[in-house]
Design a protein with these regions (language model features):
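Bacterial N-terminal signal peptides
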Residues: 5-15
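Short S/T/G/P-rich N-terminal loop/turn motif that feeds into the first structured element of a domain
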Residues: 19-225, 229-258
Length: 258
């Protein structure tokens, strides 16, 4: 991954410390499934047109990624807005923009580029702080999604806030950002459910390094104690069975943050 120019510019990445001011923006995670053979064309459209038009209409582009093992031809990206009203107004203006319509028409001369879109609205957790500009160097991002048992998201957030972030850093993982689903998911297209979902990003030197870090993390007596105490307080596991999903990502060449 190339050197980051400025994380403050794009406002995405987090540190383990709490933010001096809460980040009240609305975030959106969007996943596009490209038609067979069309992912390169989709990336070209974003590179040449879409990012500029998003900026024109007041949307903040954060990161654009593809999975390391991209068997589904996915593009995963994150945007930020002042609030939901700003988001809806920005998309309405973008979709009506003649420049967008022309770019879409030209790019789809040989067929549609996208077969399916998923979207979820996110809010920053209180332990996901904006960080100073920094370079991550070579490596991979990891997108992790946790689904909790009903009523246990607060317990999960508390465990991350008080223990997990520090232990991740101890074992060589870099905390990037942490989100919960926004309460208002109207218009979203996602299987995720508000009130029981934590979504976050880490960086690692490699997928192998990630495995080694998590193996050491899970064996750490401090983690074992924190996990046991949090589950005792909640009355059971904080996440549902098979409720932790992980996907390694690499940034596209046009991603603002790399």
């Amino acid at each position: 991954m190339k050197t980051l120019l400025s994380l403050l510019t794009f406002g995405l990445f987090a540190s383990a410390a709490a933010a001096a001011e809460p980040d009240t923006r609305l975030f959106e995670m969007r996943v596009y499934y490209a038609a067979d053979g069309k992912l390169d064309a989709l990336n070209a459209r974003f590179r040449d047109h879409t990012l500029k038009l998003f900026a024109k209409h007041g949307m903040t582009s954060l990161g654009y990624f593809v999975p390391v093992k991209n068997t589904e031809n996915k593009l995963v990206y994150f945007l930020a807005y002042a609030d939901r009203a700003a988001r809806d107004a920005a998309w309405k203006a973008f979709q009506a923009d003649p420049d967008w319509k022309a770019a879409q028409k030209a790019s789809e001369a040989n067929g549609k580029l996208i077969t399916k879109v998923e979207a979820a609205f996110l809010t920053a957790t209180d332990y996901s702080a904006l960080a100073a500009p920094k370079a991550y160097g070579q490596g991979v991002f990891e997108l992790r999604t946790y689904t909790t048992e009903a009523g246990r998201l607060d317990n999960l957030n508390a465990r991350f806030r008080e223990h997990t972030l520090k232990l991740f850093e101890k074992h060589g993982m870099t905390n990037v950002t942490y989100w919960n689903l926004a309460a208002d998911q109207k218009g979203a297209k996602s299987p995720l459910v508000a009130g029981n979902t934590l979504i976050y990003l880490l960086t690692h030197k490699s997928a192998d390094a990630a495995k080694a870090s998590f193996d050491a993390f899970r064996a750490d007596p401090a983690w074992i104690a924190a996990k046991e105490a949090s589950e005792k307080k909640a009355g059971g596991s904080l996440t549902i069975k098979d409720g932790v999903k992980s996907e390694f990502l690499v940034p596209t060449d046009y991603s603002p943050v790399k």
